[in-house]
Amino acid sequence: MQSNGTGQEQNHPANTQNGDANGLQSNAGSASGASGTGSGSLKKKKRLSQAEEDVIRLIGQHLHGLGLNQTVDLLMQESGCRLEHSSATKFRNHVMEGEWDKAENDLNELKALMHSPNAIVRMKFLLLQQKYLEYLEDGKVLEALQVLRGELTPLKYNTDRIHVLSGYLMCSHAEDLKAKAEWEGKGAGSRCRLLDKLQTYLPPSVMLPPRRLQTLLRQAVELQRDRCLYHNTKLDSSLDSVSLLLDHVCSRKQFPCYTQQILTEHCNEVWFCKFSNDGTKLATGSKDTTVIIWQVEPDTHQLKLLRTLEGHAYGVSYLAWSPDDVYLIACGPDDCSELWLWNVQTGELRTKMSQSHEDSLTSVAWNPDGKRFVTGGQRGQFYQCDLDGNLLESWEGVRVQCLWCMGDGRTVLASDTHQRIRGYSFEDLTDRNIVQEDHPIMSFTVSKNGRLALLNVATQGVHLWDLQDRVLVRKYQGVTQGFYTIHSCFGGHNEDFIASGSEDHKVYIWHKRSELPIVELTGHTRTVNCVSWNPCIPSLMASASDDGTVRIWGPAPFLDAQELDGLTESCSSMDS
């Protein structure tokens, strides 16, 4: 521990299916009665609501895509619905058969059914473009030229595209044409894609948007995923990896809230931990003056001691991996004037940097090019150096608490003793205020996309800021934060989660959108100084504590139901 004096839910798919089945059953009864002798038992045909008609059309479109055309015909006949307007059906068939003149005539019939008649020009342009490309592929250059000059150009639409199309006349063979036009060639594939574009101009009452049912199902699954507190994996957008028969729910047992390992090799307080950018290693720094590099086993995700980096004159309070993970820089506490730059692969010290014995170098950040880094401390030092420790630039009078290099390679963010984060440019020596807090900023980190900053604020806890809009987005509740330096992190799939240590010996995890913690992790017996989430393994997390241990957190072990019920693991849910 380091002291510092500064709506509504989506309908279940099964429910929708039952509703449709009931509606169809009613119509089926009518059909059965109609086929009889006209007796008094003839059932009155149910009048379908607009929503019911829409669902039947969606099902019909989906079945048609599966090739179940007879089933579609029976469904439309029995329900009394129409899958699409008869003019749209003709238009579809003519496009798929490549009968371009007939398809163009069909547009005249569809014009009266469209909300925007001007869209006819755009649709005609797309039709003629396909016609032109198919002529070129067939080697019919004269016919293609006639389409270009006599049909496309008179439309006076998208002249830039016409100039591009004219250049395809110079293609020597069909493969050259396909490559330059980024077009797959004449056939069902390109015509289907053309039809998808054309359908966007037609109202859904005339022709449904392409694959509409799949789109709705995908949206429903994505919404369920977004509402799932513990969702920490990537979903396949094809829907093949999910069940549509049940709502999507992730179990807490799949979340990294169970102790997998307790690393006890340090012999004093552990102040910092950080996974490498490729997720294959973990570096831990301790008050015992050592840095330990741990190897993450790819199959088991167990950590094994790789090497110990020794020789530091002070405890190690901060670590920074180079972008390529070849080097690691170690910093000490306030009274440390040295930086240690290690080659992690060989275990050799490359540079021990010190500008003055009066310096305080407590924070460091790598430039994205991996050839430079910035460092500073609360005594007013703010340097940019190369890999050999040579001073490249300096900024006077900035009392640095924490540093971060932005992805543009020019801007450096620095929190200072004035309770703010400012952006500095060493190129033109300009700076600007980005974040202003009312209490000291003990540490901060930035999301991968550079948009969000996560701050640990003295006596306040964890705050989320939008760096682009320069606004406070959220204050996360639960954590105990005094004037000790605690490091939080983004993590999980798509960085949807936030984790932080706490002075009450716990690790807190929040979903990024929720102020209340979803999980509290207990097990440490003293302040938890730092949490690091593996950037490549969403289910792996590490925490470093003043109790001298590093805990590795992962999903629940494979236990049977009885064992899981009796598991005395230190993971408690905070959702309500």
Curated annotation (Swiss-Prot):
Matches recorded under InterPro entries: CTLH_C (IPR006595), G-protein_beta_WD-40_rep (IPR020472), LisH (IPR006594), TPL_SMU1_LisH-like (IPR054532), WD40/YVTN_repeat-like_dom_sf (IPR015943), WD40_repeat_dom_sf (IPR036322), WD40_rpt (IPR001680), WD_repeat-ST_regulator (IPR051350)
UniProt WD repeat ranges: 265-304, 311-350, 356-396, 436-475, 478-520, 523-563
The keyword Repeat is assigned to this record: yes
Disulfide bonds: none
Pfam families assigned to the protein according to its UniProt record, in alphabetical order: LisH_TPL, WD40
Swiss-Prot/TrEMBL keywords: Cytoplasm, Mitochondrion, Nucleus, Phosphoprotein, Repeat, WD repeat
CDD domains the UniProt entry points to: WD40
Ranges where the record places region Disordered: 1-46
Domain LisH positions: 51-83
Places the protein is found: Cytoplasm; Nucleus; Mitochondrion
Annotated Polar residues bias: 1-20
Gene3D superfamilies: YVTN repeat-like/Quinoprotein amine dehydrogenase
Gene Ontology cellular-component terms listed: GID complex; mitochondrion; nucleus
Chain ranges of the CTLH domain: 84-143
Domain of life: Eukaryota
Residue positions where Phosphoserine is found in the record: S49
Matches recorded under SUPFAM superfamilies: WD40 repeat-like
Main localization category: cytoplasm
Record field: compositional bias (Low complexity): 21-34
GO BP terms: proteasome-mediated ubiquitin-dependent protein catabolic process
Job of this protein: G-beta-like protein involved in cell signal transduction. Acts as a negative regulator in MAPK signaling pathway. Functions as a scaffolding protein to promote G beta:gamma-mediated PLCB2 plasma membrane translocation and subsequent activation in leukocytes. Core component of the CTLH E3 ubiquitin-protein ligase complex that mediates ubiquitination and subsequent proteasomal degradation of target proteins.
Subunit-level organization: Forms homooligomers. Identified in the CTLH complex that contains at least MAEA, RMND5A (or alternatively its paralog RMND5B), GID8, WDR26, and RANBP9 and/or RANBP10. Interacts with DDB1-CUL4A/B E3 ligase complexes.
Name this polypeptide is given: WD repeat-containing protein 26
Originating species: Danio rerio (Zebrafish)
Lineage, opening ranks: Eukaryota, Metazoa, Chordata, Craniata, Vertebrata
